[in-house]
Amino acid sequence: MEIKFNYKKSKRKLKKEVEKYVLCSMIIFKQTQIKFDKDFILSEPIGHAPPNTEELSFLQSFNKVVNSLSREGREVFIRSFLLNESDIKIGGILNFSEFSIRDRRKEAMKSVSILLGCAEFERSDKKLTLQN
């Protein structure tokens, strides 16, 4: 029996987490613009000292997970999921093909969804066989 990452279900759940992230940001900071620096490290807006709430805790956890990706992974993830840019546009900016961006997006999405606990896996009935 083989266990495989379910891309479609995980992407759906991750998009809900991204929507929650944007909503929490709006509630706490009263703005929809996501803050990140030139290295695509997510951060809280400067000059805000929000109370310690469940929303703030979620924002900080989300930022920590995304910021744990490589610089390239962060940029692809933020541009794809938070800024909703197309693979073609991201590829033009980073000088990669659309297909290369798609592969990088999938890898970043898989890492983030696993770390946030929203990844879905499925079992296949394929039997693994070893060949000599």
Model-derived features: where do they sit?
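N-terminal interaction/assembly modules
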Residues: 1-65, 121-132
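Cytosolic nucleotide-binding catalytic cores of signal-transduction proteins
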Residues: 80
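Helix-turn-helix DNA-binding module
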Residues: 83-100
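Residues within the DNA-recognition helix of helix-turn-helix
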Residues: 104-107
